[in-house]
């Protein structure tokens, strides 16, 4: 399963669980548009005051240097950040 397929399932699960979900576009892979800084997690989910940044990875996928840096920065600011490689991992978190 690709990261994109996992991400679609994650968005659906989060929405069904009552989260407001934002897909954050930080890369230029498809349309040469960058809306967020490099390394920004793929999803931002909000529910009743809980803010969760989610980086999706295919099983065995590794974080880039910019992703590690951004995740560290977010956590230093008190944010909850998760790196998940499947729906079951995400389901356990929410």
What are these regions (language model features)?
Residues 1-94:
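Catalytic phosphate/metal-binding cores of nucleic-acid and nucleotide-processing enzymes, i.e., regions
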